[in-house]
């Protein structure tokens, strides 16, 4: 289950040494594939042929998706944390709902 969304700033927790510990914003989430695109991480070079819309063609750099297990969100202290889920009762309606929370600080991540 993917517990990340586009509003979270995250840190890359594993992988190549040049990218481990990098902090960036989650640009896109692919829940079916359990992958996310993080800004500035896993940048790949794509070669494009010249076409009518792109006269020159050439090389373009784009971020490629990485697995969600390699990404951790950043809590309010600026440290990498894990995400948990707990049921909280809504005081207005009396109904319970699931919320995501940071394991290190215990603060809720959902608005």
UniProtKB/Swiss-Prot annotation:
Region (Disordered): 48-111
Gene Ontology molecular function terms on file: rRNA binding; structural constituent of ribosome
Tree of life domain: Bacteria
Matches recorded under Pfam families: ribosomal_L24
Biased composition (Basic and acidic residues): 48-65, 86-95
SUPFAM superfamilies assigned: Translation proteins SH3-like domain
Matching CDD domains: KOW_RPL26
UniProt feature, compositional bias: Polar residues: 69-80
Single GO biological process annotation from the record: translation
Entry's Gene Ontology cellular component terms: ribonucleoprotein complex; ribosome
Annotated keywords: Ribonucleoprotein, Ribosomal protein, RNA-binding, rRNA-binding
Family to which this protein belongs: Belongs to the universal ribosomal protein uL24 family.
Subunit record text: Part of the 50S ribosomal subunit.
Function field: One of two assembly initiator proteins, it binds directly to the 5'-end of the 23S rRNA, where it nucleates assembly of the 50S subunit. One of the proteins that surrounds the polypeptide exit tunnel on the outside of the subunit.
Protein name per its UniProtKB record: Large ribosomal subunit protein uL24
Origin species: Salinibacter ruber (strain DSM 13855 / M31)
Taxonomic placement: Bacteria, Pseudomonadati, Rhodothermota, Rhodothermia, Rhodothermales
């Amino acid at each position: 289950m993917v517990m990340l969304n586009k509003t979270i700033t995250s840190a890359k927790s594993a992988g190549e040494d040049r990218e481990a510990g990098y902090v960036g914003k989650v640009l896109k989430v692919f829940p079916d594939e359990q992958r996310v695109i993080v800004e500035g991480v896993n940048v790949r070079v794509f070669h494009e042929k010249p076409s009518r819309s792109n006269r020159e063609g050439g090389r373009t750099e784009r971020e490629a998706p990485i697995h969600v297990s390699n990404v951790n969100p950043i809590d309010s202290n600026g440290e990498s944390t894990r995400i948990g889920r707990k049921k909280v009762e809504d005081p207005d309606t009396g109904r319970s709902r699931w919320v995501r929370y940071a394991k290190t600080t215990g603060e809720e991540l959902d608005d």
